Amino acid sequence: NTDYTFTLNREKITELADGTDRDISNGWFVGHSIKTHYGLEKIGIWQLDEAAEAAKYGEKPGRIKIKDQNKDGSIDNDNDRIILGSETPDFVMGLNNTFKYKNFDLRVFMYWRQGQMLHSEANGYGSYRIQGDPGIKVNYWTPENPTNEFPRPEKSYSDSSKLDALGYVDGSYLKIKEITLGYQLPKSWIGKIHASNIRIYCSLKNFFTFSHLDDYDPERGGSLSYPMTKQAVFGINVDF
C-alpha cells in the first residue's frame, strides 16, 4: 500500500510598500519569492594557472573566485551581487509505503524537498573555518589538492562578503524519515499467556539523508544547530 503527497508552491512579491522593486536589507525583490538569497556568486577557487587573472582582482590561487557580473574588473557588493536562489523548493513530496507478508510488516516513510537553496551558516560564517580550525573537517584548497569547494586556510583572511558566498548551497534532500519492521507472533505461540495478539517491532527514525551537503542535516534549514535526532526504537505491542 502506497500513499503520497505532492506539493507545488509558487509565490512572488508583486509590489513593495515604498514603490521600489527591491528591499535589499530584508531580501525582498518584486517578482521573486519572499525567501530569496541575494549575494555574490562563487564560481570556484582561483587555481595556480589563473594566478595572473586572480591578481587583477587582488586575489591569489587558493582564494574564493567570485563572478564579476558587470565585467568592470573589480568585485563589489553594489554591482556584483545578484539573486542566487530561493529557500522555497520547486516541490515537496512525501511517500508512505506499507508492505505486509505473512506475519511481517514493513513501513517506510520518505520525505523529499527539491530545488531549494540554503544559506549554510557553517560555511557562510566561514572565518573560523578558513583560518584552519583543526577541529573541523574541510576540503581545503592546496597546490596538491586543487579543489573548487573550499579556499586555502589563512589566519588573516577576513573578507566577509566573499566568505558569505561560501554559504549558498543546494539544499535539496531526500530523507528516509522512518523505517519500521514488525513481526506478529503466531497464535500458537501466545495462547498460553492468553494474549490475542503480540507484535514485536524495530523502528529507525532520521537515519538516512541524501543531499549535496556533507556532515549537515539540510532539514535544519542552514542554521548552526544540532541535526534531527536519530532514534532506534525496539518495542512490543500486546493485546489481550
Question: Where do the model's predicted regions map?
Answer:
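Extracytoplasmic loops and strand-loop junctions of Gram-negative outer membrane beta-barrel proteins
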Residues: S74-I83, T88, P134-K137, D159-G167, ...
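Outer-envelope beta-barrel architecture signal
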Residues: T2, F91, K102-F104, S172, ...
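Transmembrane beta-strands of outer-membrane beta-barrel pores
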Residues: F6-K12, Y101-N103, W112-Q116, E178, ...
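Membrane-embedded beta-strand positions in outer-membrane beta-barrel channels/transporters
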Residues: N1, V92-N96, E178-G182, V233-G235
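C-terminal beta-signal and terminal closure region of outer-membrane beta-barrel proteins
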Residues: I24-I43, F150, S161-L163, F207-F240
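Conserved small-residue
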Residues: N1-E87
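Extracytoplasmic gating/loop element in the C-terminal half of outer-membrane beta-barrel translocons
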Residues: R113-I200, L204
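Membrane-embedded beta-strand positions of outer-membrane beta-barrel proteins
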Residues: T2-Y4, V108, I200-C202, I236
